[in-house]
From Swiss-Prot:
It comes from Oenococcus oeni (strain ATCC BAA-331 / PSU-1). Keywords: Hydrolase, Manganese. It catalyses: adenine + H2O + H(+) = hypoxanthine + NH4(+). Its cofactor is Mn(2+). This is Adenine deaminase 2.
Length: 567
């Protein structure tokens, strides 16, 4: 007699290798699938029987590229929400906390308890470029990488994103990190951040060892990257009919996966990887393949041999669906246990230094003005133009009026962007000009500014900017909106300036108010928060800002804000 935990009857079970649902009975022993059969024998003694009455069963969902910090929640609070939507395993690249708090903060983050299986990537690019271009709270160097490689929770190298370091600097830190990983863990996947890169530059990435990409794709990029041996992780912004048609037409299912990358709290309260599945299906991906690309292919890519399929010996993580048409989730099981019976009893607090991480000088409205020679009447400026979709920007030149030595950027319909070093290292402040952002009186301030997470303020008048700056600094981090002189929306992020200790639903409610307030100020983008928060991301094309200046992303060279003036 075989003692078994659970018997599943009257279920339609997904078979990974045929991509079909068939009526089967399932036996679970010690939290693993033991047998899947038309009818189980009488040799079992079951503790419990689950009658699904025709419901559908698929493996637990695996998210092979994501950032927990994007939810602005602790790993524990994130897991309690994500598991409800069928996500049972994630591979988290926690480079945000590494940027703010270094390896000590990263390890404390990794030690947080979780209802889901959380594996981690080595943050490969902390800082995202190099310390000469941006100031961060921590740096992940070779010694830190060696330490992390010894941790069994580390299963891949996180997205390598330093374009110049990978393609044209043989002795760069990122090249040394890649070489170390290849030596110490030769089978470990090396993840990439390869936006809009093709031909010879793409070959350089792949030759260096980078074999995956999760950035925004086009049909041509998908085809070129996969044909050159890359594994493609499709996130929300890459899901459209044209891209999905490329996957389907070329039968690229085994070389791609669906991922979340960044899911903010106001989206997470409505869904996680299941939402990506629904969108992919809406764009033309057959559901059976969407399931395949969120269970089997991510497991294979990450070299998991113990999960991703419903088969003997695999971990019994599974999702019960009411129906296939709406991908409606009835229940989720972790190692054969329904999630309503799971709990976390040993939460670990973050260190006090994570709660006191903002060290900035006092600023007033006069700090948010552009001063030039009083002899000038006009001046030409390099302006960052925001796109209405996605996070790419471009540089445009605009001629601005000057009055009494002050540049009148407001009259030109521009906003001022300020990035203040927040770690108490230099106190440096960079100013930039932005078009197609907000157009009403107010400001937005945040310490959730990828990837260096310095204090960033965008505003249309200096008084509003000073109010926003002071508030986000005094509360040790956050994301807030000031309309005129009133704070109208505010998410407090007291843990390292990027994480809240509140539940997801509360964070989500507050973040939704921030998003609406940004729209009210005139910010137009498919994802306002990511659009603003990546104005500081020096690896996202094409013009971005740090505490150390305005930079051309591809060449990593500094660009002056103001050019020639006219008297």
């Amino acid at each position: 007699m075989i003692k078994a935990d659970l018997k599943i009857i009257n279920g339609q079970i997904y078979n990974t290798f045929t991509r079909q649902f068939t009526a089967k009975e399932v036996a679970i022993v010690d939290g693993k699938f033991f047998q899947i059969a038309d009818k189980l024998s009488d040799d079992f003694k079951f503790e419990d029987i689950l009658d699904l009455k025709g419901s559908y069963v698929i493996p637990g969902l695996i998210d092979s590229h994501m950032h927990i910090e994007s939810s602005m929640a602790t790993p524990t609070n994130f897991s309690e929400t994500a598991i409800r939507f069928g996500t049972t395993t994630v591979i988290a690249d926690a480079h945000e906390i590494a940027n703010t708090s270094g390896i000590k903060g990263l390890k404390r983050f990794m030690d947080q308890p979780s209802l889901i299986d959380t594996f981690f990537a080595i943050p490969s690019s902390v800082p995202s470029t190099n310390p000469e271009l941006e100031t961060t709270g921590g740096i992940i160097d070779l010694e830190e990488v060696k330490e992390l490689l010894a941790d069994p929770r580390i299963i891949c190298l996180g997205e390598a994103m330093n374009f110049k370091g990978i393609t044209s600097e043989p002795n760069s830190l990122i090249r040394k990190i890649i070489a170390l990983c290849q030596k110490k863990r030769p089978r470990m996947p090396l993840e990439g951040h390869v936006p809009n890169i093709s031909k010879e530059d793409l070959a350089k990435f792949i030759f260096a060892g980078i074999l995956s990409d999760h950035t925004q794709q086009t049909p041509a990029l998908i085809k070129e990257k996969i044909e050159n041996g890359m594994f493609i992780q499709l996130q929300k912004k890459s899901l459209n009919k044209e891209n999905i048609e490329t996957i389907v037409k070329n039968h690229f299912y085994d070389y791609s996966a669906l991922v979340t990358d960044d899911t903010m709290a106001d989206d997470l309260i409505n869904g996680h990887l299941n939402s990506i599945i629904k969108l992919a299906v809406k764009c033309g991906l057959p559901l059976e393949w969407a399931i395949y690309m969120t269970t089997y292919t991510p497991a294979q890519h990450m070299h998991f041999q113990d999960r991703g399929v419903i088969a003997p010996g695999k971990i019994a993580d599974f999702v019960v669906l009411n129906n296939l048409d709406g991908f409606s989730i009835k229940n989720v099981y972790k190692r054969g246990v329904p999630i309503d019976k799971l709990s976390i009893d040993d939460e670990k607090p973050f260190a006090s230094e994570e709660y006191h991480s903002i060290y900035v000088p006092n600023r007033s409205a006069k700090d948010f003005t552009l001063r030039v020679s009083k002899d000038l009447k006009k001046i030409t400026a390099n302006v960052i133009e925001i796109a209405a979709k996605g996070t790419f920007t471009k540089a445009v030149k605009k001629e601005l009026l000057v009055k009494d030595g002050i540049v009148d950027w407001q009259k030109a319909g521009l906003a001022l962007l300020a990035v203040q070093e927040r770690y108490g290292k230099t106190g440096q402040l960079t100013l930039a000009l932005v078009s197609k952002s907000i157009n009403k009186s107010g400001a937005i301030a945040t310490t959730w500014a990828h990837d260096h997470h310095n204090l960033m303020v965008l505003g249309t008048n200096p008084d509003s900017m000073a109010i926003a700056y002071d508030k986000v600094a005094s509360q040790q981090g956050g994301y807030l909106v000031v309309k005129d002189k009133e704070i109208v929306a505010n998410v407090q992020l007291p843990i390292a300036g990027i994480i809240s200790d509140e539940p997801i639903d509360i964070i989500g409610h507050k973040l939704k108010k921030v998003r609406l307030a940004m729209k009210d100020l005139g910010y137009v983008n498919t994802n306002e928060i990511m659009s603003l928060s990546t104005l500081s991301l020096l690896v996202s094309p094409s013009i971005k800002v740090s505490d150390k200046g305005i930079f051309d992303v591809k060449t990593q060279t500094k660009i002056p804000l103001l050019l020639a003036g006219e008297e």
